[in-house]
């Protein structure tokens, strides 16, 4: 399943700030959603008993008809199967995305140049789910009509994220102010530490941002908006040099 996405950048980009979505089909295929489960294993070495023969050569100790449990205590394994681990990870990701749990791990700050941005208050490992890009999900045709309406008002910034999923074009419109922090993450093509993915949860698709690498506490979160059209670059050169 191929997914492509871009976040629209326009000349009316909001003054206080300054995507190709990675392929993903559903939660089952999400790439290392988070470090949600681990397991440990223990193993023992079994040394077979030696056959003993008397000097007369007539006595042989034969253990072939005995149960191994007579000699070794059976220990219950605490190891989980790979399916159990995968199911637990998927369930944890589902809850985290739907409940917006990670919002509390991020903070809004103001930069003198870019305006508002988002920093992390905790460390993230490569592949961890960080935050969802939340807004109003709509089909491409509807989004283009709304985009045209926005273009008539220079006071409205661009928070529309266009992407393709299952061979169909969609858009998430996060223009309206909200408490969701994903909409305030700034752009960087030179040093992004996040990437976008589309996952399906309970029949609905969600655009999420995951760590491209280890991210340290206090770092600003950044991802590549992905818009490379000539018109957009001409109006917003910072898209290719930040």
Swiss-Prot record:
Location of the region described as Disordered in the Swiss-Prot/TrEMBL record: 1-61
Segments forming domain SET: 104-226
Record's subcellular location: Nucleus; Chromosome
Reactions catalysed, as given in the entry: L-lysyl(20)-[histone H4] + S-adenosyl-L-methionine = N(6)-methyl-L-lysyl(20)-[histone H4] + S-adenosyl-L-homocysteine + H(+)
Residues that, per the record, bind S-adenosyl-L-methionine: 114-116, 159, 186-187
UniProt KW keywords: Chromatin regulator, Chromosome, Methyltransferase, Nucleus, S-adenosyl-L-methionine, Transcription, Transcription regulation, Transferase
Matching InterPro entries: KMT5A (IPR051760), KMT5A-like (IPR016858), KMT5A-like_SET (IPR047266), SET_dom (IPR001214), SET_dom_sf (IPR046341)
Low complexity: compositionally biased ranges: 30-43
Disruption phenotype: Mutant animals lack methylation of 'Lys-20' of histone H4 (H4K20me). In a glp-1(e2141) mutant background which lacks a germline, the X-linked genes aco-1, ajm-1 and apl-1 are up-regulated. RNAi-mediated knockdown leads to embryonic lethality in a mutant background of the dosage compensation proteins dpy-21 or dpy-28. Increases 'Lys-16' acetylation of histone H4 on hermaphrodite X chromosomes. In the TOR complex 2 mutant background rict-1, suppresses the growth delay and elevated body fat index.
GO MF annotation terms: histone H4K20 methyltransferase activity; histone H4K20 monomethyltransferase activity; RNA binding
Coiled coil spans: none
Function summary: Histone methyltransferase that specifically monomethylates 'Lys-20' of histone H4 (H4K20me1). H4K20me1 is enriched on hermaphrodite X chromosomes and during mitosis. Involved in dosage compensation by repression of X-linked gene expression in hermaphrodites. Plays a role in growth and body fat regulation downstream of the TOR complex 2 pathway.
Protein name as it appears in the record: Histone-lysine N-methyltransferase set-1
